């Protein structure tokens, strides 16, 4: 009896609220075995066939590809896609995909070469020796995703389960009408499906493994029981046929009695669910080394002559599959991808088959009935009775229609599985699922916008905080700079404090006066001399500053000096190269001396008439002195080369000596009348004084060497002496005036 009760508890199933029993319409396609479809000429492979971001392209236009070759790289939740056959990549461009609005997504377009060559396949028959991480990575890189309709990456799902999974559920319910892809797969490939289940169990290490299958699939149930006859680790649970018992939350409750919490996942209660087709794809990826390049697709509907289930390559155009099955379209033919309750109508037939495509339904005009007009809600609550998620579809309809997003969220519209049971039972023919889909899309867009706004606000606040910190740091630096004195100020303050302390120390010392001693004023005298030296140093700095603004162009002065030196050298060379027999004409020499004296007198008159404010450029004066010296040397050489019989005129010599002395005195007066700030080069002055003294001595020697017979005219000598005395007196007076 206890064993009976234990077996009853072990095989117990639960029932969920709501649900409907629509016509199954499965016998149209589940009676024929799986078959292959001829290769299409062109394949369109969308890069995104799963939940998550698209992968990174690793092929380019013109590349040759083989079947199973990766077209994208998968990182994180990015699942790679693979070439369904061998051929050439002819384009990488947006193309309409399996979507209610046929939205264009980036796709790789391949022209098949007809050879259908595989890449080298490396199967892991000994997968039990592989680590959990290696198996998960292989499943992910081989592109395996949930084939039941969600399209969630299987590797990511297994990784997220971790060690907290106690129950592994294999969903074999396939509850929606018309769809028989999983049914036919279990009938034809039951052993491979079970092998894939064992691989998943090896990765997750669950406490129990449950296969949930509806009782309307007797052939599949028989095949699974035959394969599991010798297995005690996998339990096959047959459940009543009820739509939507194949939903993840509903099947979890049916088999375990546990409910997935609101906003949570099945892994939160220790349950992980995989589809039958996913288990088969895992087996082919791990053991056979084949990426997912094809899947089972149901072709059904009264508009198809040969309904059944086929192996459809991913990327095959829908039109190609339907034509192979004998598609006979009517005038207003409808083609539905998926089932009649959860599927969507295709806007055109050139969309490709993707990983989540499980059925192509082409009903006739009478099969689904005439479309009926939407009417007003009568509040019959039939939708609430049929809802398997225990929601209030009537209220959600009003909130969705009135754009009341907050109230729709409060009434848990996110828990709607969009099964269509409410729309099926609605007597007013209201397309409730369409309203709910639109409302959830709008809420998702609003949340996305709020997320972006929050991120922008966070960035703005971070920027403001950074600017405030920088501003506070600048103010602190300014305050510190204002409080702390500079290095120069510190030195001045220290010197002032030292002087104050010295004065205080001197004030505290007693003054002792001794009789007969003189006061020692050496310190005072030294301080006075120091102040005078400091004043002279400042005056010299000011004079240098003023000289920098008033000096003549140094380049012009240098050029003039260079020209004078060149002329002097030229004259010296000419005189040195002259023949010794050639004699200098004394008359020409006398004329040149007279011209020089006239120029000197003219220069003296111009300088005497000049304004006293005008300053004499010492460099120009030096250049003129150099020119005068050169001319004097020339005259001296000419006189030395003259005939020895010719005697020097003592009167001319006296006049020239007087002129030289007058020029020397005038130069001294000009230097004395210059501004006190202007400094005369002492070396130049010494050179000029030495030259003047040399000229004077030379003239005196010439006078002493003159003939004694020749007498000087006393009147001319008296006149010259009077002129010299007058000039000396005038120079003395001018000097006194300048000193005052």
Swiss-Prot record:
One of its GO terms (molecular function) is metal ion binding. Its cofactor is [4Fe-4S] cluster. Keywords: 4Fe-4S, Cell inner membrane, Cell membrane, Electron transport, Iron, Iron-sulfur, Membrane, Metal-binding, Repeat, Translocase, Transport. Signal peptide: none annotated. It is a peripheral membrane protein. Binds 2 [4Fe-4S] clusters per subunit. Gene3D superfamilies: 3.30.70.20, NADH-ubiquinone oxidoreductase 51kDa subunit. It holds the Pfam family Fer4_7. [4Fe-4S] cluster 2 binds at residues 387, 416, 419, 422. The keyword Iron-sulfur applies. InterPro entries: 4Fe4S_Fe-S-bd, 4Fe4S_Fe_S_CS, Ion_transpt_RnfC/RsxC, Nuo51_FMN-bd, Nuo51_FMN-bd_sf, RnfC_N, Soluble_ligand-bd. The keyword Chaperone does not apply. Residues 602-716 are annotated as: Disordered. Its main location: membrane. One of its GO terms (cellular component) is plasma membrane. Part of a membrane-bound complex that couples electron transfer with translocation of ions across the membrane. Required to maintain the reduced state of SoxR. Belongs to the 4Fe4S bacterial-type ferredoxin family. RnfC subfamily. The complex is composed of six subunits: RsxA, RsxB, RsxC, RsxD, RsxE and RsxG. This is Ion-translocating oxidoreductase complex subunit C.
């Amino acid at each position: 009896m206890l064993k009976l009760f234990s077996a009853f508890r072990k095989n117990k199933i639960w029932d969920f609220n709501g649900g409907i029993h629509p016509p199954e319409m499965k016998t149209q396609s589940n009676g024929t075995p799986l078959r292959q479809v001829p290769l299409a000429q062109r394949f369109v492979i969308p890069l995104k066939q799963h939940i998550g971001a698209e992968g990174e392209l690793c092929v380019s236009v013109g590349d040759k590809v083989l079947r199973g070759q990766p077209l994208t790289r998968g990182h994180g939740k990015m699942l790679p896609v693979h070439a369904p056959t061998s051929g050439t990549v002819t384009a990488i461009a947006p193309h309409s995909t399996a979507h209610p609005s046929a939205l264009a997504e980036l796709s790789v377009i391949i022209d098949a070469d007809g050879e259908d060559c595989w890449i080298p396949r490396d199967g892991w028959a000994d997968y039990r020796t592989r680590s959990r991480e290696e198996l998960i990575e292989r499943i992910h890189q081989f592109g395996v995703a949930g084939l039941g309709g969600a399209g969630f990456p299987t590797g990511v799902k297994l990784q997220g389960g971790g060690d907290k999974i106690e129950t592994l559920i294999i969903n074999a319910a396939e509850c929606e009408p018309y769809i028989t892809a999983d049914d036919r797969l279990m009938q034809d490939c039951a052993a491979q499906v079970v092998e894939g289940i064992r691989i998943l169990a090896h990765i997750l290490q669950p406490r129990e493994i449950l296969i949930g299958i509806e009782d309307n699939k007797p052939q599949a149930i028989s095949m699974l029981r035959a394969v599991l006859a010798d297995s005690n680790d996998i339990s096959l649970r047959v459940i009543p046929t009820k739509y939507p018992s194949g939903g993840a939350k509903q099947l979890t409750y049916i088999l375990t009695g546990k409910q997935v919490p609101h906003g949570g996942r099945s892994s939160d209660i220790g349950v992980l669910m995989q589809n039958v087709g996913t288990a088969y794809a895992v087996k082919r990826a791990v053991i056979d080394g084949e990426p997912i390049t094809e899947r089972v697709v149901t072709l059904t509907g009264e508009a198809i002559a040969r309904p059944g289930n086929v192996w459809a390559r991913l990327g095959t155009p829908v039109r190609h599959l339907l034509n192979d099955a004998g598609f006979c379209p009517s005038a207003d033919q409808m083609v539905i991808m998926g089932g009649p309750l959860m599927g969507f109508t295709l806007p055109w037939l050139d969309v490709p088959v993707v990983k989540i495509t499980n059925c192509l339904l082409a009903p006739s005009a009478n099969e689904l009935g005439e479309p009926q007009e939407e009417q007003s809600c009568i509040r019959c609550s039939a939708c609430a009775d049929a809802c398997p998620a225990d929601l209030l579809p009537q209220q959600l309809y009003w909130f969705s229609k009135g754009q009341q997003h907050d109230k729709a969220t409060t009434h848990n519209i996110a828990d709607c599985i969009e099964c269509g049971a409410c729309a099926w039972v609605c007597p007013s023919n209201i397309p409730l699922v369409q309203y709910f889909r639109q409302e959830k899309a709008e809420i998702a867009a609003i949340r996305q916008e709020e997320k972006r706004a929050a991120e922008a606000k966070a960035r703005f606040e971070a920027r403001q905080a950074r600017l405030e910190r920088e501003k506070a740091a600048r103010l602190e630096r300014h305050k510190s700079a204002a409080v702390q004195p500079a290095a120069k100020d510190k030195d001045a303050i220290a010197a002032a404090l030292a002087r104050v302390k010295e004065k205080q120390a001197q004030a505290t010392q007693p003054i002792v006066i001794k009789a007969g001693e003189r006061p020692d004023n050496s310190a005072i005298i030294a301080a006075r001399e120091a102040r005078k030296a400091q004043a002279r140093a400042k005056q010299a700095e000011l004079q240098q500053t003023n000289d920098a603004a008033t000096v003549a162009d140094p380049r012009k002065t240098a050029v003039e000096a260079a020209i004078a030196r060149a002329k002097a050298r030229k004259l010296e060379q000419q005189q040195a190269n002259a023949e010794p027999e050639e004699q200098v004409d004394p008359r020409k020499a006398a004329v040149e001396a007279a011209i020089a004296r006239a120029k000197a007198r003219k220069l003296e008159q111009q300088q005497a008439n000049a304004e006293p404010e005008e300053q004499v450029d010492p460099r120009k004066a030096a250049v003129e002195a150099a020119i005068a010296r050169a001319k004097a040397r020339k005259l001296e050489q000419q006189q030395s080369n003259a005939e020895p019989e010719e005697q020097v005129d003592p009167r001319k010599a006296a006049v020239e000596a007087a002129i030289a002395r007058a020029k020397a005195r005038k130069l001294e007066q000009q230097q004395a009348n210059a501004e006190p700030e202007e400094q005369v080069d002492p070396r130049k002055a010494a050179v000029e004084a030495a030259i003047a003294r040399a000229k004077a001595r030379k003239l005196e020697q010439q006078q002493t060497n003159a003939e004694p017979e020749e007498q000087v005219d006393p009147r001319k000598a008296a006149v010259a002496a009077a002129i010299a005395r007058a000039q000396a007196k005038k120079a003395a007076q001018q000097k006194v005036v300048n000193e005052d």
